[in-house]
Amino acid sequence: MSLSIDVTGLPSISSSVYKNESSSTTSTISGKSIGRSEQYISPDAEAFRKYMLSKSPEDIGPSDSASNDPLTSFSIRSNAVKTNADAGVSMDSSAQSRPSSDIGYDQMDFSLNKGIKFDATVDSSISISTTSKKEKSKNKNKYKKCYPKIEAESDSDDYILDDSDSDDGKCKNCKYKKKYFALRLRMKQVAMQLIKDL
């Protein structure tokens, strides 16, 4: 009996999504102008900015980040400060705030670039074969050795020593001696046969 399954290929799945959102905000945390680009996942940058401005600085935590991925998440601290209505929540790494001024704005450029492409191809082969094991079991029975049968009897009068011999410590008139030597000879023959078979 043979069973064979071949899977030569599966349909490939590919999709690409490209979206670019950018907005510029200003911050007055540091005294120098820095241009940076942050990537995040958000359906609407303007809606996210309004949501963040509507919250109290004490209520802003890591869960308000647009993404939990360290590479694309915002650097929002639990003690984030709000600078002004135009700047929104500060993304600067400094935890200390500085009085607002008209100089030294940090330029924040938020952009979203997302692309997904998935291609899967599977090549596999499964083969199962079975054979009958009855023939092997029959062959094993043919080579089975037949060893000489050893007969043993329960305690009878011929196997029990006389009471008179128990005091001497030696077997002078022992009815069991003849049976013992016959049994020992048979055991020796069985042992020799086993050694030859091995």
Curated annotation (Swiss-Prot):
Residues annotated as binding Mg(2+): 92
Main location: host cell
GO molecular function terms noted in the UniProt entry: ATP hydrolysis activity; magnesium ion binding; nucleotide binding; RNA binding
Post-translational modification as stated in the protein's UniProt record: O-glycosylated. Hyperphosphorylated on serine residues, when in dimeric form. Phosphorylation by host CK1 is required for the hyperphosphorylation of NSP5 dimer.
Pfam families tied to this protein: Rota_NS26
Essential cofactor(s): Mg(2+)
Start-end of Low complexity biased regions: 22-37
GO cellular component: a single term: host cell cytoplasm
InterPro entries attached to this UniProt entry: Rotavirus_A/C_NSP5
Ranges for region Disordered: 13-37, 52-72, 86-106
Places the protein is found: Host cytoplasm
Residues bearing PTM Phosphoserine: 67, 154, 156, 164, 166
One GO term of the biological process aspect: viral genome replication
Entry similarity comment: Belongs to the rotavirus NSP5 family.
Protein name: Non-structural protein 5
